[in-house]
Amino acid sequence: MIGYGHSVHLQTHWRDNQGALFPLSPPCTLVTFSDAVARSVLESHDKLFMRWESAFDQGHHTAWWHIIKDQAVTLSDLSSNTRSKVRRGLKSFDCASISRDTVLSEAYEVYKSAFARYETHEKEFSRNEFLNAVKALPDQTEFWGVRDKVSGALVAFSENYVEAEVSFYNTIWFEPSALRKYSSYALFYEMNLHYLEERKFRYVSDGARSLSHDTQIHDFLESKFGFRKAYARLHVVYAPWLRVAVAVAFPLRNLIEKVRLGPFKKASILLKQEEIRRECAKVAN
């Protein structure tokens, strides 16, 4: 979902989403802090839970990861099939950095058509909600757009959070008709080239393992563009009442997952996160 509140705690930028705190700062930059310190931040801001990572990309396989690319790649480095699709995408579309004003004036219809593709519990934004969300994004946000070469129409856009020579491809929205013409191949190729080759960033990332929906985008990036899993240990602390609720509901997680109603979907996501947290704790111990 595009749009979120943001704040700074523990020398880290945080994203406030649906009453919880998630790191915006890259996991490679996070300072070490205890669960007790995290609970004090959580309580002072009256949030439901706080999530973060440690031991990022240290070679230990865990149940939690980010999908990253840390090696610059030219077109000739890609498979012949991927090269062909990138070229076909670039033949039909122009991909370039765009301004926030351009997103505000042109991107809502792209967002709306792309949103319909996702199976998610999240609510679709109205135009005004979308505009307010884009306006509120942090100054570290960079936008990329994809335009049809014939019509000039915007058919896709990406919202990237940039910090410490890392670009996080936070949300990306494609019109379905543009996807069929390989717009995604063109956009990822151009953004990877820009950040890794031209600006010499440490890495680019499409974010952490998804809990709420399956876009298959991570598999796509791994198989087509050489992204990889950077494993980490997942940490979560909860508000006191939620900690009790999670502990009580955890043995019922498989049953709750089968109920497709909205509140149960959210509960299932929360319990999946807790399952991963426990698995990571076992590895650490």
Task: Indicate residue ranges for each PLM-predicted region.
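Well-ordered, non-membrane alpha-helical segments in soluble/globular domains
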Residues: 31-39, 127-129, 186-190
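Aromatic (often tryptophan-rich) hydrophobic motifs at membrane interfaces
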Residues: 142-244
